[in-house]
């Protein structure tokens, strides 16, 4: 089984969601039991809704448990910052053409959220930055065309 990189923050969020779902599980079972008491199961909307909710909850639990089982948790805060861009690093780049400054944290696929500045380790920008150092200039082929960035700061937050 191949390990999948995940930040410590990503692991924490998954564990919190798993905990929430595990606490929800008995409530769903209770709702199914109450709906069963209402009689005929063929036309019992409450029963069918509770069973559907149970199926969704169980699928989410299995999915999270699987993700945690294959996760290789990388906590960059415990690493010495060498100025090298690695998984989990927060990188501030300057677009050489527009002088626009952008900050990205390189995270796992499930953690990516471009609006929050978290980009997937498999994205073109992350692939172009990983392995480079603070002060390097990199040319990256993006869906919007070729971009040239200067790596301004590399932080292990």
From Swiss-Prot:
UniProt protein name: Transcription elongation factor GreA
Organism name: Vibrio cholerae serotype O1 (strain ATCC 39315 / El Tor Inaba N16961)
InterPro entries per the UniProt record, alphabetical: GreA/GreB_C_sf (IPR036953), TF_GreA/GreB_CS (IPR018151), Tscrpt_elong_fac_GreA (IPR006359), Tscrpt_elong_fac_GreA/B (IPR028624), Tscrpt_elong_fac_GreA/B_C (IPR001437), Tscrpt_elong_fac_GreA/B_fam (IPR023459), Tscrpt_elong_fac_GreA/B_N (IPR022691), Tscrpt_elong_fac_GreA/B_N_sf (IPR036805)
Function (record text): Necessary for efficient RNA polymerase transcription elongation past template-encoded arresting sites. The arresting sites in DNA have the property of trapping a certain fraction of elongating RNA polymerases that pass through, resulting in locked ternary complexes. Cleavage of the nascent transcript by cleavage factors such as GreA or GreB allows the resumption of elongation from the new 3'terminus. GreA releases sequences of 2 to 3 nucleotides.
Statement: the UniProt record of this protein carries the keyword Nucleotide-binding: no
Domain of life assignment: Bacteria
This protein's UniProt keywords: Coiled coil, DNA-binding, Transcription, Transcription regulation
Family under the similarity heading: Belongs to the GreA/GreB family.
Molecular-function annotations in GO: DNA binding; RNA polymerase binding
Pfam families to which the protein is assigned, alphabetical: GreA_GreB, GreA_GreB_N
GO biological process, one term: regulation of DNA-templated transcription elongation
Coiled-coil parts of chain: 14-37
């Amino acid at each position: 089984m191949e390990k999948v990189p995940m930040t410590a923050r990503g692991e924490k969020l998954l564990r919190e969601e798993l905990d929430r779902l595990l606490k929800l599980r008995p409530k769903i079972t209770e709702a199914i039991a109450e709906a069963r008491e209402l009689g005929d199961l063929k036309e019992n909307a409450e029963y069918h809704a509770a069973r559907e909710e149970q199926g969704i909850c169980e699928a989410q639990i299995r999915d999270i448990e699987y993700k945690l089982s294959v996760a290789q948790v990388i906590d960059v805060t415990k690493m010495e910052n060498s100025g090298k861009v690695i998984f989990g690093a927060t990188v501030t780049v300057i677009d050489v053409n527009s002088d626009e400054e952008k900050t990205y944290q390189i995270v796992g696929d499930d953690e990516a959220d471009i609006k929050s500045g978290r980009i997937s380790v498999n994205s073109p920008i992350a692939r172009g930055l990983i392995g480079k150092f603070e002060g390097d200039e990199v040319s990256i082929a993006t869906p919007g065309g070729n971009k040239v960035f200067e790596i301004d700061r590399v932080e292990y937050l």
